[in-house]
Amino acid sequence: QRRRGAIFLVHAVEKGEEIGPPIDMAKAEAAAALNVLASPLLHAYRHVIIRKTAALHIPDIYQWPETAHEGGLLGYGPRLDDVMRQLGRQIVEILGGASPANHPIHQPTKLALAINLKTAKEIGLTIASSLVVHANDVIE
């Protein structure tokens, strides 16, 4: 799909062994970057994705900032530990008798940006200093 001069290639995967081919296709299509959405499957296989994108020199962007600490290029979104704390509070309320049907849905209110400059250097990418100064975490 083309949006504002960019072409978005969307690939759904349902099993771990399906992760590699879309990354290879991104390289073959000279994709500018790979945006890895937050899903249990992709999170479980994040190390596979990180290794493969690094080997192919594809910039990788994740929905969890922690992924940049694990070797991904960039992560932007709620911190996983904050999400788990909120989930824990909701579970305690439900176990304490609150009805799940009447329980409000809590959206993250705090987002973080993590940039891995080491990964950027390894794949030959320069990150603009104007972006780096806004990062919550910079991995060098």
Please name every model-derived segment.
Residues 1-140:
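Short hydrophobic alpha-helices and adjacent helix-cap/hinge residues
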